Amino acid sequence: MKMNNPVLILGAGISGLGAAYKLSCNGQQTVVLEKDTTYGGLCGNFTIDGFRFDRFVHFSFAKDEQVNRIFMDGAGEVFRHVPNAYNLYQGIWIKHPAQNNLYPLSQKMKDAVVRDFLSRPTDIDSSQIQNYDQWLRLQFGHFFAEHFPIPYTKKYWMTEAKDLETRWMGSREGSRLYQPSVEEVIQGCNTSETPVTYYSKEMRYPRKGGFKQFLSALVENQDIRYNQQVISIDVENRLLRTSKGDEYQFDRLISSLPLPEVIKMLKNVPVDVCNAAARLHCTCGYQISVGLKTKNIPPYLWWYIYDEDILPARVYSPSLKSPDNVPEGRSEERRVGKEC
């Protein structure tokens, strides 16, 4: 069967749905092709015996008014959580971010962190920083960097900090990795009573339906066709084929799929482009979902694990995000690991 459509969008995750929503608001006809049986992508979820698990770790802390309006239209009611993330380091619970909440550590370790923090060079131009390893040492000193973010980077990103660039860190004000003052580091060594310095002051989550519920307003009145896995794209003839044998003629094509996968679908791709695609790196996440018969779990929405002998990089508790995620009287945890 051959179908004519002015704009085809590949993938019904948040990116593909966002593109369809924006175009339809401007009066443009769209068709979204999704290989799965429902929308959501990594923002989707699945349910086993009454336990609902998001496909990855999600909260909303968006500041854009339009995004928040769309999310609220979809979710209806939300829980508004104050971030209470913690860190697990050698059996010790440390408030997040660790760099200005070191109170539970031994005095010897705290002294080493403060000493290195005070001895950081202050006259280095940011343009001289060549990688993430250098950035971490410059921000926090050698001791803290080597015991906390550098080993965590290897666990989470499955690569060395020296192999990562730093543009993703953004500005000091917008960075997800808090950069405390000397006074904040010292205060966090002397007391556990410290203010919340997480990069977002509020984390929002739907009361019902999991994180996917935020996206439900995006799918209203959209032409989304499921079980449509794209296998080939003929750019010259503007023709796309799916594994079911359907063909779609397109004027414009928008893809939210991984770039190397799109390259495989295209015809007559130059060798240098194929080679460039093969050199691209990505990190894949794996989650272990656990439903528990008890509510007796740590009271933290999520926590990071710095110890290299413990495989998961972080753990989070969907039942604390919303009790709708679990049967009554139960709880759940998800352990997150990464693999190249």
Q: What function would you assign to each model-found segment?
A:
Residues 24-47:
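Glycine-rich FAD pyrophosphate-binding loop
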